[in-house]
């Protein structure tokens, strides 16, 4: 399994990021005694319903501390809890995972710029920047 972005001839981080090559971790990874990732990262939360050929990208985020980002409060955690509860009520299976790309700029401004480019490219429904487009019932802005 790859644990960071896959490198190519291009220096463009958007072109290097291959989400499906990144190692999927359970959303509870932050409870592990040792984190598999440290430092700056872009992270992606995906669901892989068994009836779909491709996973669903739900959220794109960035952090300076991959090993600590999800330990505290995080809006996306509550969105994912609501999403999971709804799927269970409807008897629909899900396979949620989080994937980290640690081959990103350490400088917060540049990393956030990359995060915003990815959000605009992929339009994940749980990011606040795309809520008007998707009007998902799982986020705080109803």
Predicted regions: what they are:
Residues 1-58, 62-142:
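Boundary/linker segments flanking structured domains
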